[in-house]
């Protein structure tokens, strides 16, 4: 079984409704393997190219632009790697409970 880590680089805020993370990746740096147990979205704060690897062995490469908002999939084990030449960052918002 794969050891899972945090969904972001730094936990910024948490209450009963949301959890907000910062994710910062230098070129060729990867996040921890992780699982989002809730619905979530992320907002790109420094654009770049990410490779997403899933626990089932599949992967994808995505170009992400400044300010882009992406809804993520709850329940998939994955990690992302910055395959670009510049630093990449985003803000992740996990939706814990409905408002």
List where the protein language model places each region.
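Short acidic-glycine-tyrosine-enriched beta hairpin
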Residues: 56-74
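Ligand-binding loop in jelly-roll beta-barrel domains
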Residues: 74-98
């Amino acid at each position: 079984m794969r050891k899972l880590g945090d969904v972001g680089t730094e936990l910024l805020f948490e209450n009963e409704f949301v959890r907000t993370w910062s994710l910062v990746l230098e070129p060729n740096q990867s996040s921890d393997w992780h699982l989002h147990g809730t619905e979530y979205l992320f907002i790109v704060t420094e654009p770049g190219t990410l490779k997403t690897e899933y626990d089932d062995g599949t992967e994808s490469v995505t170009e992400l632009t400044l300010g882009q908002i992406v809804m993520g999939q709850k329940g998939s084990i994955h990690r992302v790697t910055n395959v670009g030449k510049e630093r990449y960052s985003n803000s992740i918002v996990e939706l814990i409970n409905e408002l």
